[in-house]
């Protein structure tokens, strides 16, 4: 039986939400994103095992907005309450409960969904101070669980993840097992590769190319971001053009695309490129969606 669920991570700015998500995912998701996006938009971290999938939604820090952008960020964070089954409300152990926390608590009460209080940064306080913090927050709301952690050091993080696993219900695997985020980097990577294909082949295969990012992961051995992409075309003749004589064209496409991708990610990249024929994919709705041309997403 496969189990799955969506979990929001809410809290004031700088309480360690992203640090927690990065630790759970085993890599810095923020590295593979535009800084403005990672701080202003919801970020999805997809944690998948053989039997479970937890889709974490890291949110912008909730604060009193002073600009339209601030309004957007806060509403973006609160909008996740309509999308998830569980909320992790994260607070810092080394700061007392404030007005910002109280504001969030009132919204959480109104949402009527299970809330786990996560007290982060326990490595910074004495156990007595932690107990006071627990009692204070417990007096404000009926939390499903209260879990103290140190996201930076990893203390008790696995316990929290196991708790979430235990509370998952039977469900679908919403994302492929090798996908760890919904970041637009996959889309940008595919566009960079497609741009090189169009540039180098000029008018030979202008409209029949789609690029799918099959996987994008950090290789712990080489410390490179390993990206596998498939260039889709509609005819065998187009496949031959893109591969080129003895693979020369495909190698050139990969070399130029890798350079741009490394500049975007700020990381060393190993880019693996493949070419496949998918006849008449441009006229098939399922193929269009599979290749990233989903009207709802872009």
UniProtKB/Swiss-Prot annotation:
<dbReference type="GO" id="GO:0005525">
    <property type="term" value="F:GTP binding"/>
</dbReference>
<dbReference type="GO" id="GO:0000028">
    <property type="term" value="P:ribosomal small subunit assembly"/>
</dbReference>
<feature type="domain" description="KH type-2">
    <location>
        <begin position="201"/>
        <end position="279"/>
    </location>
</feature>
<dbReference type="InterPro" id="IPR005662">
    <property type="entry name" value="GTPase_Era-like"/>
</dbReference>
<feature type="domain" description="Era-type G">
    <location>
        <begin position="3"/>
        <end position="170"/>
    </location>
</feature>
<dbReference type="InterPro" id="IPR009019">
    <property type="entry name" value="KH_sf_prok-type"/>
</dbReference>
<keyword id="KW-0547">Nucleotide-binding</keyword>
<dbReference type="InterPro" id="IPR030388">
    <property type="entry name" value="G_ERA_dom"/>
</dbReference>
<dbReference type="GO" id="GO:0070181">
    <property type="term" value="F:small ribosomal subunit rRNA binding"/>
</dbReference>
<dbReference type="InterPro" id="IPR027417">
    <property type="entry name" value="P-loop_NTPase"/>
</dbReference>
<dbReference type="InterPro" id="IPR004044">
    <property type="entry name" value="KH_dom_type_2"/>
</dbReference>
<feature type="binding site">
    <location>
        <begin position="120"/>
        <end position="123"/>
    </location>
    <ligand>
        <name>GTP</name>
    </ligand>
</feature>
<feature type="region of interest" description="G5">
    <location>
        <begin position="149"/>
        <end position="151"/>
    </location>
</feature>
<dbReference type="Pfam" id="PF01926">
    <property type="entry name" value="MMR_HSR1"/>
</dbReference>
<dbReference type="GO" id="GO:0043024">
    <property type="term" value="F:ribosomal small subunit binding"/>
</dbReference>
<comment type="similarity">
    <text>Belongs to the TRAFAC class TrmE-Era-EngA-EngB-Septin-like GTPase superfamily. Era GTPase family.</text>
</comment>
<dbReference type="Pfam" id="PF07650">
    <property type="entry name" value="KH_2"/>
</dbReference>
<dbReference type="InterPro" id="IPR005225">
    <property type="entry name" value="Small_GTP-bd"/>
</dbReference>
<feature type="binding site">
    <location>
        <begin position="11"/>
        <end position="18"/>
    </location>
    <ligand>
        <name>GTP</name>
    </ligand>
</feature>
<dbReference type="InterPro" id="IPR015946">
    <property type="entry name" value="KH_dom-like_a/b"/>
</dbReference>
<dbReference type="InterPro" id="IPR006073">
    <property type="entry name" value="GTP-bd"/>
</dbReference>
<dbReference type="GO" id="GO:0005886">
    <property type="term" value="C:plasma membrane"/>
</dbReference>
<keyword id="KW-0690">Ribosome biogenesis</keyword>
<feature type="binding site">
    <location>
        <begin position="58"/>
        <end position="62"/>
    </location>
    <ligand>
        <name>GTP</name>
    </ligand>
</feature>
<keyword id="KW-0963">Cytoplasm</keyword>
<feature type="region of interest" description="G4">
    <location>
        <begin position="120"/>
        <end position="123"/>
    </location>
</feature>
<feature type="region of interest" description="G3">
    <location>
        <begin position="58"/>
        <end position="61"/>
    </location>
</feature>
<keyword id="KW-0472">Membrane</keyword>
<keyword id="KW-0699">rRNA-binding</keyword>
<feature type="region of interest" description="G1">
    <location>
        <begin position="11"/>
        <end position="18"/>
    </location>
</feature>
<comment type="subunit">
    <text>Monomer.</text>
</comment>
<feature type="region of interest" description="G2">
    <location>
        <begin position="37"/>
        <end position="41"/>
    </location>
</feature>
<dbReference type="GO" id="GO:0003924">
    <property type="term" value="F:GTPase activity"/>
</dbReference>
<dbReference type="GO" id="GO:0005829">
    <property type="term" value="C:cytosol"/>
</dbReference>
<protein>
    <recommendedName>
        <fullName>GTPase Era</fullName>
    </recommendedName>
</protein>
<keyword id="KW-0694">RNA-binding</keyword>
<keyword id="KW-1003">Cell membrane</keyword>
<keyword id="KW-0342">GTP-binding</keyword>
<comment type="function">
    <text>An essential GTPase that binds both GDP and GTP, with rapid nucleotide exchange. Plays a role in 16S rRNA processing and 30S ribosomal subunit biogenesis and possibly also in cell cycle regulation and energy metabolism.</text>
</comment>
């Amino acid at each position: 039986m496969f189990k799955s669920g969506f979990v929001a991570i809410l809290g004031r700015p700088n309480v360690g939400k992203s640090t927690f998500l990065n630790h759970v995912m085993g890599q810095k998701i923020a590295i593979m994103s535009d800084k403005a996006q990672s701080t202003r938009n919801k970020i999805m971290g997809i944690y998948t095992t053989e039997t479970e999938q937890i889709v974490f939604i890291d949110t912008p820090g909730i604060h009193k907005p002073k600009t339209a952008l601030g309004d957007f960020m806060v509403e973006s964070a609160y909008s996740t309450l309509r999308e998830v089954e569980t909320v992790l409300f994260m607070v810092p152990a080394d700061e007392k409960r404030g007005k910002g926390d109280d504001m969030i608590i009132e919204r959480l009460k109104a949402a009527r969904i299970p809330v786990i209080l996560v007290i982060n940064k326990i490595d910074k306080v004495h156990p007595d101070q932690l107990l006071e913090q627990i009692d204070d927050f417990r007096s404000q709301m009926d939390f499903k669980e209260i879990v103290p952690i140190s996201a930076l050091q990893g203390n008790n993080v696995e316990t929290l993840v196991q708790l979430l696993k235990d509370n998952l219900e039977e469900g679908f695997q919403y994302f492929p097992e090798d996908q760890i985020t919904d970041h637009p980097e996959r889309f940008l990577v595919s566009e960079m590769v497609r741009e090189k294909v169009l540039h180098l082949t000029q008018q030979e295969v202008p409209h029949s190319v789609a690029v799918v990012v099959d996987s994008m992961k950090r290789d712990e051995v080489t410390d490179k971001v390993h990206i596998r992409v498939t260039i889709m075309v509609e005819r065998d003749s187009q496949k031959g053009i893109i591969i080129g004589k003895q693979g020369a064209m495909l190698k050139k496409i990969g070399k130029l695309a890798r350079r741009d991708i490394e500049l975007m990610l700020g990381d060393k990249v190993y880019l693996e490129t493949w070419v496949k024929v998918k006849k008449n994919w441009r006229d098939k709705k399922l193929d269009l969606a599979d290749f990233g041309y989903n009207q709802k997403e872009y």
